[in-house]
Amino acid sequence: MRVLAIRHHDIDTVGFIGEAFEARGASLAVHLFPDEGPLPALDGVDYVIVFGAVSSVNDPDPWIAEELAWLRGADHAGVPVLGICFGAQALCAALGGRVERMPDKEVGWFTVESADEDAVPAGPWLEFHEDHCLLPAGATVLARNDSAVQAFRIGRHLAVQFHPEVDGPLLKRWLDAHTDAETRKLGIDPDQFLADTIREEPASRARADRLVATALAIRDS
């Protein structure tokens, strides 16, 4: 299985999600977009993962419109996608939904109400977002909480608002990209956030593995 992972920041990693695909024998190629140039052709690609971004899907940057068009192309070509955070919102917008700003950012560890906890565990999951999805026609909600739709499927695609890939080192890079004051303004103690993330790593790895199993089951359904 050839998997193409799209990152948007050089500090990001594929984390537990990439690990779970590789454990299933996947060959993983990673493309940093837009820094490494145009999105690759999908010839020979069996699965796509689109990770998070600081940008909003509604920002006017040309690369965002390019990515939405590319995702529509993946859908038309029958290439399944796992969208994570920005990737989930991009998939939503590409397929006819809308993305809107939330009243408050959702940052930290949160549980979700899952329609099927074997498919999408209740968590907790790490969240780091301020936009949310208004789903396109044909999408099915798999999990939600009071803030947002947290997981949905549409066609052969799976999208999750949370970050199942994140381990301690990745979160530390994210926190280091913000000042301590910026993080605390969100009501987050960065040291505690990092400690909680490190403590959750074994369970996070297992939840990410379960999510990849669900993504592949949706692909095959």
PLM segments and residue spans:
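Flexible gly/pro-rich beta->alpha loop and the following alpha-helix that scaffold active-site loops
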Residues: G18-L82
